[in-house]
């Protein structure tokens, strides 16, 4: 019997660089409150958000991904031709087809490479990172661009007092490739589809097209249900990720949870029993919840400000729509 040949790749994989793109328009809580009965103090006390960024009308998930990726590629001293895979995590590429990733790959000069999207809500970046690491270890690629990009502002009903102050726009990219030491631990991921309605689009696009005079689709969220699930279940996921990577809580230098709500992340930090001096990402304060882009955006900010250092051991936990989650232990990139 003829055996089918297979491939194998390098075992030590890590993050080479990170690039970020933040839209220029800053939206304050006071501006949000022009459409709802609320206040800057109320929003901040419950979410930790002071401001967020909204993309311009001409900007898209793809255009922001391209800008973030150009920065990541430049920081790694590479060119588009050095990249042999592009994975985009997004829920806001507003075309059924073509996917966002091939558009991004072409703009960056990544020719004839696998380029595809994944949609896993706010945990999308963790899913994409896990897939990229496994592709490289399996020999399917050597250097992969992993991107989280979202333009959530058009999906939000700005009169919905339950979530209109939460979501925002932005993109960030990491380059994944060979590392002298292991830089990405095993991915712990999963989903709970029984809670799918907790974060959802309320009307599908076909129903809207058949009744254009009716209400348009918006993003809806059951905030209390999501808060309880994330605050009390994601600590277990984080511990599983540390166990899988063979590290202990007191060895974690940096904690980068999905930037959904600073109160959730305070509870997660406590439940994980991290070191008192561990750096906790709080990019949400001035960025809002950017879904699949939030973890790499927070990573970029920590490195840019010097709060975290290259090589620091970091725990990443993404969680959100699905409900879904993905977590890894990684080493912070050099740039």
UniProtKB/Swiss-Prot annotation:
Keyword Acyltransferase: yes
InterPro entries the record matches: ACP_syn_III_C (IPR013747), ACP_syn_III_N (IPR013751), FabH (IPR004655), Thiolase-like (IPR016039)
Active-site residue list: 122, 258, 289
GO biological process terms held by the UniProt record: fatty acid biosynthetic process; secondary metabolite biosynthetic process
Pathway membership: Lipid metabolism; fatty acid biosynthesis; Lipid metabolism; mycolic acid biosynthesis
EC number: 2.3.1.301
Region ranges (ACP-binding): 259-263
Keywords, sorted A to Z: Acyltransferase, Cytoplasm, Fatty acid biosynthesis, Fatty acid metabolism, Lipid biosynthesis, Lipid metabolism, Multifunctional enzyme, Transferase
Listed Pfam families: ACP_syn_III, ACP_syn_III_C
Quaternary context: Homodimer.
Family to which the UniProt record says this protein belongs: Belongs to the thiolase-like superfamily. FabH family.
Domain comment as written in the entry: The last Arg residue of the ACP-binding site is essential for the weak association between ACP/AcpP and FabH.
Free-text function comment from the UniProt entry: Catalyzes the condensation reaction of fatty acid synthesis by the addition to an acyl acceptor of two carbons from malonyl-ACP. Catalyzes the first condensation reaction which initiates fatty acid synthesis and may therefore play a role in governing the total rate of fatty acid production. Possesses both acetoacetyl-ACP synthase and acetyl transacylase activities. Its substrate specificity determines the biosynthesis of branched-chain and/or straight-chain of fatty acids.
Annotated protein name in UniProt: Mycobacterial beta-ketoacyl-[acyl-carrier-protein] synthase III
Organism: Mycobacterium marinum (strain ATCC BAA-535 / M)
